[in-house]
Amino acid sequence: GDACNLVSEMHNYDLVFAGNLIDRLYQPQLFLDSMTQRIRVGGWLVITSPYTWLEDYTPPGYWLGGYVDNTGIPVDTFTGLSRALHPHFKLGCRENIPFVIRETARKHQHTIAELTAWHRVE
């Protein structure tokens, strides 16, 4: 499926989990904007990601972080998520989650994702 173009029948959820997804969407803001229609007030949006923004997946103009803004200030993805979800979601928790991806029998990739849990407040 296309997380940026979900069918309208998908709504009134208590929880949406977006595991290692946000930095692989072609327009992550579309996905985040749709969460106000998908998650009921009182529900949760949980996002995990190492925030590895790559042009192969997301054009740089759509990145939520990992860039320098037009005033020269670096923007990290957590800040971008916070801006994108305000005022409909309030941060509930923020944790680092380490994980390992096996590439071959002798090569593994150790990565730390950030988990954020956002409470739908309005």
Q: What is each of the regions a protein language model found here?
A:
Residues 94-122:
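Core SAM-dependent methyltransferase catalytic element
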Residues 15-27:
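A short SAM/SAH-binding and catalytic strip from SAM-dependent methyltransferases
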Residues 8, 26-30:
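Short N-terminal helix/helix-N-cap motif within the alpha/beta-hydrolase-1
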Residues 4-16:
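A short acidic, Gly/Pro-enriched loop at the edge of an enzyme's catalytic core
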Residues 50-57:
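Short "lid" loop at the C-terminus of a central beta-strand within the Rossmann-like core
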Residues 29-41:
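A short glycine-rich, Lys/Arg-flanked "PGG" loop and its adjoining helix->strand segment in the class I
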Residues 42-50:
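Conserved beta-strand signature within the Rossmann-like core of class I S-adenosyl-L-methionine
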Residues 58-94:
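Conserved Class I S-adenosyl-L-methionine
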